[in-house]
Amino acid sequence: MKDINIILTRHGRYNNSRDKSDLSIGHITEEGKREIAEKTKKRIDRIVGNKLKDTTFLIIASPTYWLSDERFGRRAIETEKVTKAEIMEELKQEGLSEEEAKSHFYLKPEIYTRQKTNGVSIEELRDKLAEPNVYDLAPSYIEKLKVRYGGMNSGFWKELASSEEVKQYNKDAEGPTDLRRKITELLNYVVEWSKDYSKSQDTNVCIFLITHGETMEPFIQNRKLSHITEFGYNEGIVFNVKEDGIIIKTEDELFIGPPPKVKDGYILGRD
């Protein structure tokens, strides 16, 4: 079986000001761009290694605008662009032309699986990585948590990722169970697609899923995969897909998941 790795990661450093008179808010900063490029290079070196020319890349990022306002930045989409640019540079350093490097990215608008023979659109998959709608649909709950914890600190984020109290404010607001389900469904789709695609095209596959800390943390906490309660900028975990299971690792390759070769359904499954 060829190598298949899925990197679930938070977006990079951005201008998190809420001053709506500043149109640079929500955009990845120059420091953030450098950090993303450096992190991507390290990831490629560690995860892909000398198999770069025999690897197909798929990058899917959250479509969310900062403050849900189209005037401002889309930090996950911008992280995707920097990530892709760095991978392109790595490929060209291997002697590939611009067009040859581009051919190493899966760019079709859908992926196809046995579950979804008509295809699942990349846009639908992007939506599963979106920032939780709690900020728009239950702002009073967010304000209550801020008061309870004295701001948006570690206690705030831990409760946001684990409590279903938000449903008391708006039943349509996404709670931890909703977010876990979205990430689970996304992972199930891309795992199945990557296995089929890798086999049919005889290629290694490396997938970047770029999202928000609030979206990925409920999945991690519920599966008891690690001590992580909060992800820093561009931090994430790696799913190493095997024929008979999935191994999950942190960025520094400390093992945090169930024992190797655990069946897919145990780690992913459906809530």
Show the residue positions of the predicted features.
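Active-site-proximal alpha-helix that buttresses catalytic centers in soluble enzyme cores
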Residues: 1-117, 166-177, 181, 226-252, ...
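Active-site-adjacent alpha-helix immediately C-terminal to a catalytic or transition-state-stabilizing loop
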Residues: 20, 181-249
